[in-house]
């Protein structure tokens, strides 16, 4: 499933085609994705101007001139693809209609924005912009890891006394929004923390020290266009490249990249997810 860097990359890719532009026509090709699409969705979108595109955790929100916001969740295999007239650098020569093109937005200026989702685990909804943060998908989310509200004091306070593994704590969207399995594995490696270590055992300084590492990993991943492992593509159809710089994720049995370390990357399963780590470097 796309994590924060992938969703932010898609948001940035959509911006030239959508931000400030009118939706001249919307087409909905099926009534549901993961859940039923909102009633009269095509009618409610057509003629609306996109005021801005923003991201909350792993969700994209397009704020519309009529007072509603289009909430987009890519799910496991969803893609937002831009085709048609060249708008900025994010244009993909995407034939229409393709089999899994479920929602199509014809934009002012000639660009076409298509939501394509072969597995239909993605979702779309229309919500009042002023109440978007109360939507069930957003209401319980913690602060953004790249935002000002997420700092060392906050994270140290949230981890103090927690008797869950530090990996599980960082994946808890109520503590910090948008982190997923890939990037938490990479963060814990850089921090030298074993994924099974109890969050409450870190102490204030080590817990607070996770914040700059989280920011560093996410920023590097966004700069690389995210990580393409299976279905993820940028809005122009290109792959992300951060997977080529993974230090532990997906590297089971390979040598640790830490200079002087003779350990091999291991894999354990926590709550149904693979945790990649170096048993020598991470304690």
Curated annotation (Swiss-Prot):
Its cofactor is Zn(2+). Signal peptide: none annotated. Its EC number is 3.2.2.23, 4.2.99.18. The active site is at 2 (schiff-base intermediate with dna), 3 (proton donor), 58 (proton donor), 273 (proton donor). Belongs to the FPG family. The lineage of its organism: Bacteria, Pseudomonadati, Pseudomonadota, Alphaproteobacteria, Rhodobacterales. Gene3D superfamilies: 1.10.8.50, MutM-like, N-terminal. HAMAP family: Fapy_DNA_glycosyl. One of its GO terms (molecular function) is damaged DNA binding. This is Formamidopyrimidine-DNA glycosylase. InterPro entries: DNA_glyclase/AP_lyase_DNA-bd, Formamido-pyr_DNA_Glyclase, FPG_cat, MutM-like_N-ter, Ribosomal_uS13-like_H2TH, Znf_DNA_glyclase/AP_lyase.
């Amino acid at each position: 499933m796309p994590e924060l860097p992938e969703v932010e990359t898609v948001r940035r890719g959509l911006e030239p085609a959508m931000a400030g532009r009118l939706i001249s026509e919307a087409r909905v090709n099926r009534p549901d994705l993961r859940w039923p699409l909102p009633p009269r969705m095509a009618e409610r979108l057509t003629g609306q101007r996109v005021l801005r595109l923003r991201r909350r955790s792993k969700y994209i929100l397009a704020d519309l001139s009529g007072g509603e916001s289009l909430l987009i969740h890519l799910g496991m295999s969803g893609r937002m693809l831009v085709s048609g007239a060249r708008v900025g650098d994010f244009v993909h020569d995407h034939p229409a209609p393709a089999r899994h093109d479920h929602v199509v937005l014809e934009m002012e200026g000639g660009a076409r924005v298509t939501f394509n989702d072969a597995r239909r685990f993605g979702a779309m909804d229309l919500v009042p912009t002023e109440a978007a943060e109360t939507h069930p998908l957003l209401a319980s989310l913690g602060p953004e890891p790249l935002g000002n509200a997420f700092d060392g004091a906050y994270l140290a306070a949230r981890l103090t006394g927690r008797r869950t593994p530090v990996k599980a704590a960082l994946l808890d969207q109520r503590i910090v929004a948008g982190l997923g399995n890939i990037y938490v594995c990479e963060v814990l490696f850089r921090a030298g923390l074993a994924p099974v270590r109890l969050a409450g055992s870190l102490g204030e300084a080590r817990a607070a020290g996770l914040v700059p590492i989280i920011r560093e990993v996410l920023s590097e991943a966004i700069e690389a266009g995210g990580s393409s492992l299976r279905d993820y593509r940028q809005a122009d159809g290109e792959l992300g490249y951060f997977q080529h710089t993974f230090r532990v994720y997906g590297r089971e049995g390979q040598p640790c990249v830490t200079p002087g370390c003779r350990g091999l990357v291991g894999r354990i399963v926590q709550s149904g997810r693979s945790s990649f780590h170096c048993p020598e470097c991470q304690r």
